[in-house]
Amino acid sequence: GPAGGTAAYHLAKQGRSVLVLERESLPRYKACGGGVSPAIAKWFDFDFSPVISLKVDTIRFTWKKGDPVETKIQTIEPVWMVQRDVFDHFLVKQAVSKGAELKDSTEVKSIEFKSDHWEVSTANGIFSARYLVAADGAAGPMAKWLGFKEPKRRMAAALEAPAAPGQDKSKILFEFGTIKNGYIW
């Protein structure tokens, strides 16, 4: 994801030895609204335009499909809309271009700290590292393996569908009240 790709990019850029272990084969689908703040550009020295699907400068909020509130986003650059499979893979490719190694389709099975290094066991072998970046997402096992208290989880679902034909693509739409304890974006 974006956190792992970003960490890999910056570490590899500094000349560190970086191995990215990705459970899925890249690019991989990820249900997501796809809104990215253009402010991230200042943290990178490459152009994101190849992976920006759309730039959006207006947000519209509704309650039970009525009572609309609309506002222009007051930033220099509009919000970037991206497809997560394309965006995430792009970040990892940037890391690889700086020297990181990618092993996708490589699920981590366990981690263990030995006196001065981490041992990472995967279905494809065991890897050793002095440092470990746990960027496996909110539902990943790393936090538990590292001994962090498990947060109280609430069930949630994500569904991604194409916008209706004729939909105004210059606006991000947020609908509240239609789904209990949730929203539609």
Name the predicted role of every residue range.
Residues G1-V20:
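N-terminal Rossmann-like FAD-binding beta1-loop-alpha1 element of flavoenzymes
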Residues H10, Q14, L26, Q94-W185:
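Predominantly flavin-linked oxidoreductase catalytic cores and closely associated redox partners
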